[in-house]
Amino acid sequence: MTSRGEKVQAAGLTEVPALTPGPARKPAAALAVRAGLVALAAAVLFFCYWRQSQAVPLSSDGSSNVLQAWAMLHGNLLLHNWWVSDVSFYTTELPQYMLIEALAGLGPWVVHAAAAMTYTLLVLLAAVLAAGGRPPGTPRSFFRGDPSPRTPLGKGYPPPRTPRALLAAGLMLSPQLGATSILLLSPDHTGTAVPLLVIWLLIDRARPHWYVPVMVGLLFTVTMVGDSIILLTGIVPLVLVGAGRAAAGLIRRGKRDASTWYELGMAGAAAGAGVAGSFGPRVMAALGGYRQSPIAADTDLSQLQHGAWVTFQGFLELFGANVFKPTFFGTRPALEVVFVAIHLAGAILAVWALGVGLARIFRPGELIVPVFAVAIVANLGAYMISTHAQDLLGAREMAALLPLGAVLAGRLLGDRIATWTRAARRWFVPVISVLTAGYLAALGFGAAQAPVPAGGEPLAGWLAAHGLTRGLASYWQANSTTVASSGHVVVSAVVPDVRDHLVPYLWESDLASYDPARHFANFVVADGPSVWPGMQLSAQLTFGHPARAYHVDGYTILVWNTNVLAKLDKSA
């Protein structure tokens, strides 16, 4: 037999090189096994994240989104009469909530299941995106179908992609308990990273053609309608890098090749999406849909030093490595302290990958690397000078840093770490094994936490037992109580106005629920944990002296024999 590439000679013929066989296709059985393993891993991850999510009580924020999805599921697709917050999540989490509610009904479990689903998707998408770019093949020109001499979005396609995927998934594998409310609970920008990674899978894997930027622009626009944070995490970084690299290429080579036009097309599509998406709230209101609360100016340069420190801690918190948290050396269990220390390795790798990515901004090659690096820097900078940088809970505004950093680390460092593992097996393999075991143990530790009831569950149970099925309360006792009761008790949010009279709270509320012609409400949760100051006095000024008053579990519940909605000032 002739060896691969060996010349052969037939009688009467000149020597020709033997044909080189193409790469063998993976058998269907092997692909099925691989798909089964991925499905099993996804199921295990979903279960662990679902369990950890239940360790944090559901509040009115997530409950409001549950009720909005419930309204959409029952025909109010545009959320007519609804006032949403400054982020609607209309095209991101709400469709997901509708799907879960169609299968499981209305209740607190919707948020926990959705959070687990979202984070599982993020881990899997980060692994796939970190694994590698567009498959090999002859690239095409952006405007024509002509072959291009250069690969627009990346040079080469390294075969060993598993280390990259494992590293990216590993860095996200086990969110620490302190970050559960950010990463594994209500919609708070974490879920917006799912469509972001999907968009980048399209950019990274699709062959360059004119319709790819068009699809990218449409996806960015749809995502921005739901959450404008995509401006910082995807749109602005792509515009800056695309335009910057095009300008640098023009200066360096004096002409625009297919790669330059393609990246400019991506940047233009992203810029157009940013403009179009900004009109989303106004378009929805004009169509008779929800009205969105305006996004307040949140820049505060007077606390820059404090903001920088909180930003640094927030970055560590997202990666599960915040050793500067006040409870680190104190009230935390010793095991949790160990997990946080182990997660420092992941945070260090993310910072290392960020530095490598920034150094490649103007280097021809993968577009995803400099864009993700710029996105991380933009998010850190915007958060640092914002009013959100007051405490660690505000780190939800930069939750996308975790998947972005994980993808960068896997993409840029996965092969290098695999090489080190082979070269220094004696000492490097034990280090990797300890870190892997630590991350897996942290995943199990989070899943082992005891579930806690939803925030409004005790109050909802008492109200239902006493026949009080519709009433008013402060924001934090309103929608959370409604969802905790699976809709059997409906509590609408009110707030004192300048006259100390109660008026509807135009934040995550359905104005139809205040209509006295359609509903009868006869109680107010007037005092208790997180209740607006002065609620009891405002309730009596608005509705008169109550017929009965109850004091239950720290709450004061005032009851009237009349419909209090009739006296509620809805003009305010």
Predicted regions and their residues:
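Membrane-interface micro-motifs in multi-pass membrane enzymes
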Residues: 58, 86, 90, 157-204, ...
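Membrane-interface alpha helices of multi-pass inner-membrane proteins
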Residues: 212-239
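Short hydrophobic/aromatic helix or loop-helix immediately within or flanking a transmembrane segment
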Residues: 64-70, 83-106, 313-329
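Membrane-proximal lumenal/periplasmic loop motifs of glycosylation machinery
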Residues: 52-60, 74-95, 108-109
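Transmembrane-helix motifs of polytopic, lipid-linked glycan transferases
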Residues: 38, 113-157, 198, 348-352
